[in-house]
Amino acid sequence: MCNCGSSGEKPTFNDRKSTSYEHLFKYIMVGDSAVGKSNLLLQFVDKRFAPNSDFTIGVEFGSRSININDKQIKLQIWDTAGQEKFRSITRAYYRGAVCAMIVYDITRRDSFESLNSWLTDCRKFSSCDVTTVLIGNKADLEANRQVSTSEAKEFAEKNGLMFFETSAKTALNVDEAFEKSTEQILKKLESNPGLLSNEGNN
């Protein structure tokens, strides 16, 4: 794990290295503070949830290898801080990313209303071929929902995004979001072999 400018006790992520892999895909996770980005990463990489995790300061890193269509793919995932004061740091990590996950909290309307700003950054600072995924996190808190599934789905369709509602706590759709987006990247790679010319670079 790499912590850039971090302070305080943070969850640690295992780097599940395989002896070999066919591709290295760089992912970046963005979105407002406290929407659950760090716990999504923790759940995907370590299969656990940290209910009292601190806000991300700067950038955190985790990786995991998965098998898609008989291909071993290593995902290198960068979890970025959501605070405005770290926005310039976050923007630097779009470079070389083949997937951007934009995360909001289904129980916080304000985090959904920030999506246009995050999407603008994504389109400005990442490759035009980047696969973009909209993640509505904290789906386990249905009673506190402030953003309907249909509204989020409409936003995703309007902007050409993949869409999943997830729960980092229960693991709902966490693996699916990474696996399905990886499948989409592999499809793009078939028609554009140069897509990964900068794979894994910051």
From Swiss-Prot:
<dbReference type="GO" id="GO:0005794">
    <property type="term" value="C:Golgi apparatus"/>
</dbReference>
<dbReference type="Pfam" id="PF00071">
    <property type="entry name" value="Ras"/>
</dbReference>
<keyword id="KW-0547">Nucleotide-binding</keyword>
<dbReference type="GO" id="GO:0016192">
    <property type="term" value="P:vesicle-mediated transport"/>
</dbReference>
<dbReference type="GO" id="GO:0140220">
    <property type="term" value="C:pathogen-containing vacuole"/>
</dbReference>
<feature type="binding site">
    <location>
        <begin position="137"/>
        <end position="140"/>
    </location>
    <ligand>
        <name>GTP</name>
    </ligand>
</feature>
<feature type="binding site">
    <location>
        <begin position="31"/>
        <end position="38"/>
    </location>
    <ligand>
        <name>GTP</name>
    </ligand>
</feature>
<comment type="similarity">
    <text>Belongs to the small GTPase superfamily. Rab family.</text>
</comment>
<dbReference type="GO" id="GO:0000139">
    <property type="term" value="C:Golgi membrane"/>
</dbReference>
<dbReference type="InterPro" id="IPR050209">
    <property type="entry name" value="Rab_GTPases_membrane_traffic"/>
</dbReference>
<dbReference type="InterPro" id="IPR005225">
    <property type="entry name" value="Small_GTP-bd"/>
</dbReference>
<feature type="short sequence motif" description="Effector region">
    <location>
        <begin position="53"/>
        <end position="61"/>
    </location>
</feature>
<protein>
    <recommendedName>
        <fullName>Ras-related protein Rab-2B</fullName>
    </recommendedName>
</protein>
<dbReference type="InterPro" id="IPR027417">
    <property type="entry name" value="P-loop_NTPase"/>
</dbReference>
<dbReference type="GO" id="GO:0006971">
    <property type="term" value="P:hypotonic response"/>
</dbReference>
<feature type="binding site">
    <location>
        <begin position="79"/>
        <end position="83"/>
    </location>
    <ligand>
        <name>GTP</name>
    </ligand>
</feature>
<dbReference type="InterPro" id="IPR001806">
    <property type="entry name" value="Small_GTPase"/>
</dbReference>
<dbReference type="GO" id="GO:0005525">
    <property type="term" value="F:GTP binding"/>
</dbReference>
<dbReference type="GO" id="GO:0003924">
    <property type="term" value="F:GTPase activity"/>
</dbReference>
<keyword id="KW-0342">GTP-binding</keyword>
<dbReference type="GO" id="GO:0005811">
    <property type="term" value="C:lipid droplet"/>
</dbReference>
